[in-house]
């Protein structure tokens, strides 16, 4: 709203899918709305305490016409398209002034998993990577007592999905003896089921809040992978490289520079679950102070069964092939208990002094078993024994870790707050400074075969912070400043002085001499609305300095392609980010507008490679422009963007990747009550090491629709990727490697869909 971000929407003053603003706008019919209201509202915590102790929320309230304040509404849509694409979804809502019950369902094979209450709007192919079938159902129940005694919110969802994906990767590892070039290709097939329940119950007058959550997920995954490493970069692209290496007629030229190649076919199935219960109690004391009690219990469990056929071949003739038939079984359980007491002292001057004492206790145990079926000379591929007891003599004990971890944390926090809000003048000021001190006590038992390690860490960790926010001139200007220093606890798993050789090409070691990392964060934000042409400016800037950051030292054996990894501390890591967003109307009627986004990111990354420190300097510059014209039911946008990603590393040729795009969006009413929506954009990539990724892809999507029955019936024809040009490519840089990845994209299709919206409102007596 005029440059201010709406925190969430309400319907007739009540929550409506809080935090998911689009759902109301997408499902309410325009003729039911009386007016839109914008205002500041006390946060939920401030309402319970009866005073302003937090920044107020900025609310957009949709006020319905009197005759529509009670009733039903919903919509259903079905569609069928080319290339066997299909979709179906529905949404229904029953609401009154103080209650709401909603149901939704979604089924499609166009990579759409959103639902009302997700990020809002029912959308089309928002995730083009991979090929996924999705089936989901769910609902929400809300009851807000009109006498302000209690509030109940319950929601549940179930999701089934099945996906197919392909991925191709080219990489360049920066090695002192000479870079290593890798090529890999993988195909995965996944299917899974998710179940989620959330319940929030509030006794407003008592000040008690109960939050309950239950998550369950089970999965079945199949994967086939091929990879190869070279001591020199081949001239061919990845398809020619892999086809040559894994064919019967191999290229002698490629064999001369090959280090190793791997084929791996694997299957995994398992399940995970989480149960959480949390209680918050707020009590306003007679003398004006507040007491807050918190209790939380969290339980987690997981089980995974897997097997794989692994074949590693070395180019070095002195090294025999490593063929492994692996069977894995793992289980884990953990719990997390938290108890806290908070006491707030409120001064007449508007300052708040808060003391917080808390205890946190965690315990986790894992049981992992790896069986090497190839150790049995009588084993035949595809043959499985009936019981795990038949495999006990084949257990790879050194790669079957048993883990028991216990962590105790004692928190002491003191914070000083000042909140001052003046709605009449449109001003707001907030100052918060806090010092958090926690004593962390960690003990672990890690067992691999006959070897046992008992890592432990006991220390105080401090985190001071300062936050300042100031809004003025009828909310036209906003200033925000944040600083904190965080001492991060150690990960015991990285301190275990034992060796993991389950992956023959990636040997893992621990480091018992690790030190905690210390991270400094500083950020600043300024926004302003000014002038008579809807001018808006937003400036963001942040810097991060990391001391004793835990990095991974990798030592590469160029003869075999085996890497040995060990975590180490390294200094010299810092980052800076800055961006500016501008908006301005170019005409008095504000029909013609221009928007600009400019950003600069710098990463100074220090790492350890082959026991030597290496530093990468990475610059990312991005510029996006949008020119938009709107008049009545016509909207035309011209868009362009360019980004440069440059990396500098001593001993390595400079890397310069450039991505740029340009195109247009059009929405217009046509004769015969037709409406057209279309977008076309050219995406270009330059500077990639794999020349097959330097492409020009012209993407064109279009939709034409018409409404009938007073807007209740919508018939639409949709076309996704009309020119068959979509492509998905990602690049990753760090001080150890450059990785370029291509992923399968959803194929183009044409779809015809029909949507029907309905509402029913009882007559007022």
Which residues are covered by each model-predicted region?
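Extracytoplasmic beta-strand/coil segments of soluble accessory domains associated
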Residues: 1-17, 45-53
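Extracytoplasmic
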Residues: 4-6, 31-33, 55-59, 71, ...
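Conserved strand-to-helix beginnings and helix N-cap segments that scaffold or border functional pockets
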Residues: 11, 21-22, 86-89
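Short acidic/polar hinge/loop motifs at secondary-structure boundaries
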Residues: 15-42, 97
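Primarily recognizes Gram-negative and organellar outer-membrane beta-barrels
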Residues: 19-22, 42-84, 99-765
């Amino acid at each position: 709203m005029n440059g201010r971000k709406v925190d969430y929407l309400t319907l007739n003053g009540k929550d409506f899918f809080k935090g998911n603003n689009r759902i109301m706008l997408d499902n309410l019919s325009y003729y039911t709305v009386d007016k839109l209201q914008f205002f500041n509202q006390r946060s939920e915590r401030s309402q319970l305490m009866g005073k302003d102790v937090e920044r107020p929320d900025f609310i957009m309230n949709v006020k319905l016409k009197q005759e529509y304040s009670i009733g039903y509404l919903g919509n259903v849509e079905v569609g069928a398209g080319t290339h066997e694409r299909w979709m179906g979804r529905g949404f229904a809502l029953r609401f009154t002034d103080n209650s709401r019950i909603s149901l939704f369902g979604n089924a499609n094979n166009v990579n759409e998993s959103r639902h009302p209450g997700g990020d809002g709007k029912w959308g089309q192919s928002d995730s083009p990577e991979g090929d996924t079938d999705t089936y989901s159902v769910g609902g929400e129940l809300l009851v807000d007592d009109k006498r302000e005694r209690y509030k109940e919110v319950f929601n549940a969802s179930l999701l089934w999905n099945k996906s197919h994906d392909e991925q191709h990767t080219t990489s360049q590892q920066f090695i002192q003896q000479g870079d290593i070039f890798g090529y890999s290709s993988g195909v995965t097939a996944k299917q899974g089921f998710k179940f989620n329940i959330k319940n929030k119950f509030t006794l407003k007058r008592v000040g008690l809040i109960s939050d309950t959550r239950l998550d369950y997920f089970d999965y079945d995954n199949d994967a086939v992978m091929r990879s190869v490493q070279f001591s020199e970069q081949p001239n061919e692209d990845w398809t020619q490289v892999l086809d040559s290496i894994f064919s019967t007629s191999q290229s002698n030229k490629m064999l001369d520079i090959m280090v190793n190649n791997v084929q791996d076919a694997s299957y995994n199935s398992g399940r995970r679950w989480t149960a959480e219960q949390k209680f918050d109690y707020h009590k306003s004391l007679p003398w004006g102070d507040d007491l807050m009690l918190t209790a939380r219990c969290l339980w987690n469990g997981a089980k995974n069964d897997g097997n794989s056929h692994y074949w590693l071949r070395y180019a070095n003739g002195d090294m025999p092939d490593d063929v492994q038939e692996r069977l894995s079984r793992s289980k884990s359980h953990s719990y997390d208990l938290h108890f806290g007491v908070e006491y707030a002292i409120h001064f007449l001057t508007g300052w708040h002094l808060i003391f917080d004492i808390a205890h946190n206790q965690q315990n986790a145990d894992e049981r992992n078993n790896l069986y090497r079926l190839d150790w049995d000379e009588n084993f035949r591929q595809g043959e499985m024994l009936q019981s795990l007891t038949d495999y006990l003599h084949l257990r790879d004990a050194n790669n079957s870790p048993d883990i028991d971890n216990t962590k105790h944390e004692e928190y002491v926090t003191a914070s000083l707050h000042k909140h001052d809000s003046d709605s009449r003048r449109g001003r707001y000021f907030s100052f918060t400074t806090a010092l958090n001190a926690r004593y962390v006590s960690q003990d672990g038992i890690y067992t691999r075969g006959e070897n046992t390690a008992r890592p432990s860490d006991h220390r105080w960790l401090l985190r001071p912070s300062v936050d300042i926010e100031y809004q003025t001139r009828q909310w036209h200007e906003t200033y925000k400043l944040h600083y904190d220093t965080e001492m991060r606890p150690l990960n015991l798993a990285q301190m275990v002085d034992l060796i993991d050789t389950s992956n023959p090409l990636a040997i893992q070691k621990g480091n018992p001499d690790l030190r905690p990392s210390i991270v400094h964060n500083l950020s600043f934000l300024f926004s302003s609305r000014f002038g008579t042409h809807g001018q808006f400016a937003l400036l963001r800037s942040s810097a991060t300095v990391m001391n004793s950051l835990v990095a991974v030292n990798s030592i590469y054996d160029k003869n075999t392609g085996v890497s040995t990894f060990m975590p180490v501390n390294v200094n010299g890591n810092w980052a800076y980010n800055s961006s500016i967003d501008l908006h301005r109307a170019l005409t008095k009627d504000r029909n013609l507008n221009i928007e600009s986004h400019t950003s600069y990111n710098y990463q100074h990354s220090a790492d350890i490679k082959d026991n030597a420190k290496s530093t990468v300097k990475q610059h990312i510059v991005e510029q996006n422009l949008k020119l938009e014209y709107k008049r009545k039911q016509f909207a035309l946008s011209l868009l362009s963007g360019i980004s440069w990603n440059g990396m500098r590393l001593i001993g390595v040729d400079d890397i310069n990747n450039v991505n740029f795009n340009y195109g247009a969006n059009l929405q217009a009413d046509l004769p015969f009550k037709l409406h057209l929506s279309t977008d076309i954009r050219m995406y270009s990539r330059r500077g990639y090491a794999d020349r097959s990724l330097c492409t020009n892809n012209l993407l064109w999507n279009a939709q034409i629709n018409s409404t009938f029955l007073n807007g209740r019936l919508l018939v639409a024809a949709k076309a996704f990727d009309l020119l068959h040009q979509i492509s998905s490519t990602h690049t990753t840089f760090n001080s150890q490697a450059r990785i370029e990845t291509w992923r399968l994209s959803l194929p183009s299709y044409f779809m015809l869909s029909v949507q029907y919206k309905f509402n029913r409102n009882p007559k007022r007596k």
